[in-house]
Every structure is written in C-alpha cells, then in structure tokens.
Amino acid sequence: MFFTCGPNEAMVVSGFCRSPPVMVAGGRVFVLPCIQQIQRISLNTLTLNVKSEKVYTRHGVPISVTGIAQVKIQGQNKEMLAAACQMFLGKTEAEIAHIALETLEGHQRAIMAHMTVEEIYKDRQKFSEQVFKVASSDLVNMGISVVSYTLKDIHDDQDYLHSLGKARTAQVQKDARIGEAEAKRDAGIREAKAKQEKVSAQYLSEIEMAKAQRDYELKKAAYDIEVNTRRAQADLAYQLQVAKTKQQIEEQRVQVQVVERAQQVAVQEQEIARREKELEARVRKPAEAERYKLERLAEAEKSQLIMQAEAEAASVRMRGEAEAFAIGARARAEAEQMAKKAEAFQLYQEAAQLDMLLEKLPQVAEEISGPLTSANKITLVSSGSGTMGAAKVTGEVLDILTRLPESVERLTGVSISQVNHKPLRTA
C-alpha cells in the first residue's frame, strides 16, 4: 500500500528489498505489508531556550546568560537526513530538542568562559556569532542545522552589571555635561562667528557697493571721454571738410583765373601777331621792325611767364606764397626781357644805337629849346652883316641843331651820319 507524509516530516522504509532503507521527505512511498516497515521522523523547527546559570567568565565574574536557538533536522540534505535518522529515529521531538539543548548549552558555557562580562554585555553580536559557529559545526554531524541563535538576557547576582551600568551612566552623564558645555561653547563660538561673518558680509557688501560705484564712475568717465573725443573728432572733421571745401573752391577759382589769364595771353599773342603784321607793313626800316618785334615778344613772354608763375603759385601754395613766386617770376621775365633786348642790340648794333639816338634826339632838342620857351623876349644883336629878325632866330636854332650830331658824337663817340650810311649787320 501507499503511505504519504507532509513537508514537515520524513518517512523511512526498511525491510524486504529495502537495503539500504529508503528515506522520503515530504512525499509518498509504496510499502509491502508484513515484509516491510515504515517509520516517521519530524522535520519541524525546534525552539530551544538555552540557559547557562552562574557561569564564570574570563575574569572570574559569575553571570547568567539566556539564549534562544532555532534548530531542525535538515531533510533536503540526504547525508544529514541519514545521520539524523541514525541518531533520532524513533525518538520524540522533546527528546531530540533535549539533546540539541544540552549540546548548545555546553558550547554557550565554553564561549562565556573565554570572554569578559564587558565583551558579552557590550558586543552581543560577537557572542552570538561565536556560539552559532561552534554549535553549528557540532550539531551538523547529528543531522541538525542551527537556523538562528540570539542572546536573550544577561544577569548576575553580584550587581556587577548594575555597577557597570552606574559607571557607564556616570560616564554618560559626565559626557553629557561635557557635551552640553561644549555645545554651549560651540554655540557661543558659532554665534560669535555668525556675528563676525554678518559684519564681514556687511563690510564686504559695502566694499562691493563701493567697487560697483567706482566702476560705474570710471566707466561713465571713460564713456564721457569717448563721447567728447568723438564729438571733438566730428567737429574737427567738419572743420577739415570746410577747409578742404574752401581750398577746393580757391583752387577752382585759381584755375579759372589761370584759364582766363591763359585766354588773355592767347589774346595778347594774337594782338602781338597782328601788331607784328602791322609793324611789317608800316615800318620801313628792318632794324626798327625787328627791335619792335623782339620787345613785344619779350613783353609777351614776360606776361605769359608772370601769369603762368602766378597760376602755378596759386595752385601749389596759398596767396602769400603765390605772390612771392609771382614776384620771382616777374623778375625772371624782366631779366629775360633785358636779355632779349641785349641780344637785339648785339644783333643790330648800329641800327639799335641809331634807333636809341633817334628816339632820344627829340628829347635832347626839347631840353635845348626849353629855355627859349620860358623867355619873355629875345633880343638879337647883329654885327651888321647877315639876316635879321625872325629869320635870324630860325637860323640860330637850326645852327644849334646842326651842331647837335657833333655834340652827340663827342659825348657818346657814335657818329650819326656814319651809322646811318652803314649797312645793317646780322649775326
């Protein structure tokens, strides 16, 4: 027939054809009646109250310790289940719990003997871990696993723990007072620091405000300087533009004057050409015509040079420099005119001299006859021979004029009659 069990127990079948016995944890198994036997073992967790009364610790102080342990037979591990069946099969849960309790208590006492009261009291976790470790390695051979172990209570009959607590309490109270004093001190220090930081922050804020005001004023001053500079530059540019415009107008005016003077020069040149033609047609003597031509050409060139010099001076310089340049140009033109006259006199020596003499003779005659024009009356004294009256006066004047060439010859060394009869020489 079939037998079943829950997950909290295991079945062991032995007998005919069951060597070794079959162990089933939480399941079913077929058993032949009369020739096979079935037994059950509990897999429930057992809670053990492990008490160790008046155990002497490492310093010889007796204390009592109570621990709580959770143990059970391990059904998933076949080896541990086989070991548990060998040791506990047929026993009740109470008997199994008693065996495990005795084992745990022995290990608990051994751990207590190797530790001080302070270590057990202050470091319960360490004590629990050592008991769990030592007991687990021993109970596993029985097929029992320790699920957990916790230290529940520690007490003694000598008030050792109470005294230890008083000392600790006093220490704690002292630490509390010290901590309170330190806290007050720290609070005062922090308050002073806070006030100092507040004052420092206020000063820093004022400093930052002063810096900001300074930066604002500096930037404003820089902007004002830049604005004034731009304004001055604009005014200067306007003045420069006005000056340039005036200069351009003056240059255009000078150019117009130059053009006008050039036109005047052209007109004068045309007039000179016309007069030269008239001179050629009217003047009989070639020397006079040539001299007149050279003089007019020199005057024209002088006028042209003067106007060109004035125009160039006006376009290059302003009025003062232009006038100085024009004066120099006039001087050069006059010098050139004199040079042309000198060349003409050199080319036509006798004719030129004759021309000058003939030109000056009327002035000489005028100067000679000048006293006669201012005389109120003329008294003629005759020696008794020759003409009388007005004819006498005319004869005297003509006699003076006939002696004039001789006077000129004595003064200048030039004979008018000889110059007049000599042919003209050309270079």
UniProtKB/Swiss-Prot annotation:
One of its GO terms (cellular component) is extracellular exosome. InterPro entries: Band_7 (IPR001107), Band_7/SPFH_dom_sf (IPR036013), Flotillin_fam (IPR027705). One of its GO terms (molecular function) is ionotropic glutamate receptor binding. It is a peripheral membrane protein. The modification Phosphothreonine is found at residue 387. The modification Phosphoserine is found at residues 19, 163, 385. Transmembrane segments: none annotated. It is found in: Cell membrane; Endosome; Membrane, Caveola; Melanosome. Keywords: Cell membrane, Endosome, Membrane, Phosphoprotein. It comes from the Eukaryota. Belongs to the band 7/mec-2 family. Flotillin subfamily. Heterooligomeric complex of flotillin-1 and flotillin-2 and caveolin-1 and caveolin-2. Interacts with ECPAS. May act as a scaffolding protein within caveolar membranes, functionally participating in formation of caveolae or caveolae-like vesicles. This is Flotillin-1. It comes from Homo sapiens. The lineage of its organism: Eukaryota, Metazoa, Chordata, Craniata, Vertebrata. The gene is FLOT1.
